[in-house]
Swiss-Prot record:
It holds the Pfam family TatA_B_E. It is found in: Cell inner membrane. Part of the twin-arginine translocation (Tat) system that transports large folded proteins containing a characteristic twin-arginine motif in their signal peptide across membranes. TatA could form the protein-conducting channel of the Tat system. It is a single-pass membrane protein. GO terms for molecular function: protein transmembrane transporter activity. This is Sec-independent protein translocase protein TatA. Residues 46-82 are annotated as: Disordered. One of its GO terms (biological process) is protein transport by the Tat complex. Gene3D superfamilies: 1.20.5.3310. GO terms for cellular component: TAT protein transport complex. Residues 49-70 have a biased composition (Polar residues). The Tat system comprises two distinct complexes: a TatABC complex, containing multiple copies of TatA, TatB and TatC subunits, and a separate TatA complex, containing only TatA subunits. Substrates initially bind to the TatABC complex, which probably triggers association of the separate TatA complex to form the active translocon. It comes from Acidovorax sp. (strain JS42).
Amino acid sequence: MGSFSIWHWLIVLLIVVMVFGTKKLKNIGSDLGGAVKGFKDGMKDGASTDDSATTSAPAGQVTNNSTAADKTTIDVEAKHKS
């Protein structure tokens, strides 16, 4: 009595299909699959870039690499309304 039987789950599935439709459920499934694939690819890329970052600069050492973006940065002051 604590868990649902197979018949309860089939009725819930039937109601969900009737409410959302099969096309919308298919789109949700493909979106979820794409998100999981993107997450896995991101984890693989993150692990490989983390390994290369630790070998290039020792921990605790700060490097200053000036780029073209540093030359175009404008320093401004924010004015607060009172």
